[in-house]
């Protein structure tokens, strides 16, 4: 009986020890569960931060692409404006050359007209005093005819020079068309490069990066956007300045064309007056 009591007492102690150990294990389990819950919350927070960084990165990439597009468009406008400025400057030089040539022809025609007028005056006086000098009169007529031939030759030479200038202008227009063709080819190449850039952008999006690397890229994108924004502003200023210069040059070209038309009309009037004078001198 005493042995049974000892055994029951031992079993009771074992039970109490087992209960204590179970309580300790349950406490440790609860601690582990709390620790796991905390870890899960930390992981969720990190994932949330990574997701936010990815969102910020995509936004930065979108802004970068838009800024690049605006910059390319502005550069294109500036390049086109500069090309138009060069074309207008070349056209102005051509107009100035034509105007100078026309003024020279006008001066020559004026001199010839003055000579013809003097010759006409001399002829009038000569007819009064040389009625009985037929040979001298005929010689004078021959001289006037030679002068007429010379004036006609000069007028034809001036016409040839004008035709040559027109031919050069036509050649210049052909070269301009070729330049436009090269510009179209360049625009096609730009389109191809934009497509390659889009493909590269898609590949970049597919890369998995850590939170620290994503933050560094986001900072780099923002710095690039600020740089591109400054370049975009500078390019827009340059494009506006080029547009103002184009307007000024266009006004100069219009003015020179008007002056050229006026000089041509003066030359035509003088030529007609010269022809009329020679016709009167020759009695036609």
UniProtKB/Swiss-Prot annotation:
Keywords for the protein's UniProt record, in alphabetical order: Coiled coil, Repeat
Q: Does the keyword Repeat apply?
A: yes
Region of interest: Disordered: 56-78
What does the record say about tissue specificity?
Answer: Associated with the protective tegument surrounding the sporocyst.
Q: Does the keyword Coiled coil apply?
A: yes
Q: Name one Pfam family in it.
A: Tropomyosin
Residue stretches of biased makeup (Basic and acidic residues): 69-78
Locate the coiled-coil region(s) and give their ranges.
1-284
Write out the similarity annotation: Belongs to the tropomyosin family.
Assembly and interactions?
Homodimer.
Present the record's domain note. The molecule is in a coiled coil structure that is formed by 2 polypeptide chains. The sequence exhibits a prominent seven-residues periodicity.
Function of the molecule = Tropomyosin, in association with the troponin complex, plays a central role in the calcium dependent regulation of muscle contraction.
* Protein name (Swiss-Prot/TrEMBL): Tropomyosin-2
């Amino acid at each position: 009986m005493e042995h049974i009591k000892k055994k029951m007492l031992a079993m009771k102690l074992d039970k109490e020890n087992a209960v204590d150990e179970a309580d300790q294990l349950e406490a440790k389990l609860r601690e582990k569960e709390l620790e796991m819950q905390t870890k899960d919350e930390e992981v969720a927070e990190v994932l949330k931060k990574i997701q936010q960084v990815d969102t910020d990165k995509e936004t930065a990439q979108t802004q970068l692409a838009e800024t690049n597009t605006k910059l390319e468009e502005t550069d294109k406008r500036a390049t086109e404006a500069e090309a138009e400025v060069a074309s207008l400057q070349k056209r102005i030089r051509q107009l100035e050359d034509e105007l100078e040539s026309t003024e020279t022809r006008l001066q020559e025609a004026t001199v010839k007209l003055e000579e013809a007028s003097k010759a006409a005056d001399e002829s009038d006086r000569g007819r009064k005093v040389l009625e009985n000098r037929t040979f001298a009169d005929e010689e004078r007529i021959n001289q006037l005819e030679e002068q007429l031939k010379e004036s006609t030759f000069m007028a034809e030479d001036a016409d040839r020079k004008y035709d040559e200038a027109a031919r050069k202008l036509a050649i210049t227009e052909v070269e301009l068309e070729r330049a436009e063709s090269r510009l179209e080819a360049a625009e096609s190449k730009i389109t191809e490069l934009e497509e390659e850039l889009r493909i590269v952008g898609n590949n970049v999006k597919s890369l998995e990066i850590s939170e620290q690397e994503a933050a560094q890229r986001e900072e780099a994108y923002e710095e690039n956007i600020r740089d591109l924004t400054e370049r975009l502003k500078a390019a827009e200023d340059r494009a506006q300045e080029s547009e103002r210069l184009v307007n000024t040059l266009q006004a100069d070209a219009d003015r020179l064309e008007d002056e050229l038309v006026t000089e041509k009309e003066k030359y035509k009037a003088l030529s007609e007056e010269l022809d009329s004078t020679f016709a009167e001198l020759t009695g036609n």
